Amino acid sequence: MGVPKKRTSSMRRDRRRAANFKLKPVNVVKCPKCKEPVLPHRACPSCGTYKGEQITEAS
């Protein structure tokens, strides 16, 4: 049975675990009305529309 000969240091252990942590790029879509970039499933901050309806006042 495989047993480690030496103890793995915390730095080596943490570096190995951190290799799997990758940030994903933010998904951005264009607003159909004003063509500004907007996060999906959120009202457009520039024109205030969501799913073709006016939700908030335009800023």
Swiss-Prot record:
UniProt-listed HAMAP family: Ribosomal_bL32
One BP annotation, GO: translation
GO cellular component, one term: large ribosomal subunit
GO molecular function: structural constituent of ribosome
Family classification: Belongs to the bacterial ribosomal protein bL32 family.
Presence of the UniProt keyword Cell membrane in the record: no
Signal peptide: none
Listed name of the protein: Large ribosomal subunit protein bL32
SUPFAM superfamilies attached to this UniProt entry: Zn-binding ribosomal proteins
Naturally occurring in which organism (per UniProt): Anaeromyxobacter dehalogenans (strain 2CP-C)
Keywords: Ribonucleoprotein, Ribosomal protein
One Pfam family matching this protein: Ribosomal_L32p
